[in-house]
A protein has these predicted regions:
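Membrane-embedded alpha-helical bundles of multi-pass integral membrane proteins
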Residues: 1-281
Length: 282
């Protein structure tokens, strides 16, 4: 069966479970009283928050972006408490955000615009993202930001199990989240290294890539390229490796709304809300 079909057959149920999990949390949050919409239903409260957030952002976009960068991604307050903890947190959060952005750009341009360019000539620029001068930068930054996530994860695990500061409470779900991330990053680099070491895997289109340019097979993909030097004589079923990485990735996506990593999504709303209240009182 075609890998694209298999992936989407697994992906769409995953999205449904993810949205359901997020919906449970949002429903719980909306049970509280909302100033300005005290008698509203949950759905009315939800629309109220969306409208208020949308209007607030466009009224002061610079302020919102500043708070998002300084307070959420780079967690300025945490820096004053512990540099080690701040660095681990920043590498994880910034790595996730940056990887997501680059991956979306790469996926949208090489997966959709390139295909549309066959019928729409003005989209021919998209080939720069697949085979042109832009592709090496996409490959490098995906590799680099993924490496930041890996380093941040290792630092967090080291802090929890080796340094073990007195105020730290290591809960089961913290451990699950960290080891999920560690597994996905290591397996991702391993599969990349195996793909580089065995060009026949790419030719067979096992990893969904219709084309893998040279930039994805050299030192620009430094993590995978390093591992590839040790994998040339190793033979593993490439289909197994694909499932070995993709299935846990989708499971992690479903688990995300139920983990403490949810704060990547919610902390921005909480921080911005607190800053808005403080700004109103001034």
């Amino acid at each position: 069966m075609d890998k694209h079909l298999i992936f989407y057959l697994m992906f769409f149920p995953t999205v449904i479970f993810f949205v359901w999990g997020m919906g449970l949390h949002i429903s719980t949050w909306l049970e509280g009283s909302v100033e300005g919409a005290e008698e509203a239903t949950k759905w009315e409260k939800f629309k109220f928050f969306i409208r208020r957030g949308w209007r607030g952002f466009w009224a002061r976009p610079g302020w919102y972006i500043k708070i998002l960068i300084t307070e959420v991604i780079f967690h300025r307050k945490l820096l004053g408490k512990s540099f080690f903890r701040w660095l681990a947190h920043t590498l994880l959060v910034f790595g996730f955000v940056a990887t997501f952005v680059v991956d979306m750009i790469k996926g949208f341009t090489t997966g959709y615009l390139v295909e549309f360019s066959k019928d729409l000539a003005f989209l021919s620029f998209s080939h720069e993202f697949e085979t042109g001068s832009i592709r090496p930068f996409l490959d490098f930054f995906l590799e680099f930001f993924s490496f930041l996530i890996l380093v941040g994860c290792v630092m967090a695990i080291f802090r929890r199990f080796i340094l073990r500061p007195d105020q730290l409470r290591t809960e089961e779900e913290d451990i699950t989240s960290l080891f999920f991330i560690l597994f996905l990053e290591l397996s991702g680099f391993f599969i990349e290294g195996y793909r580089i070491a065995h060009p026949e895997v790419v030719k067979a289109h096992i990893y969904l890539a219709n084309l893998t340019p040279a930039s994805a097979n050299n030192w620009i993909s430094f993590g995978g390229y390093f591992l590839s030097q040790f994998l040339r004589d190793l033979k593993i079923n490439a289909d197994f490796l694909w499932y070995f990485h993709v299935v846990p990735s989708l499971i992690f996506f479903i688990y995300l709304p139920h983990s403490k990593l949810l704060h990547i999504f919610t902390s921005s709303m909480t921080v911005i809300s607190d800053r808005q209240k403080a700004l109103t009182k001034v």
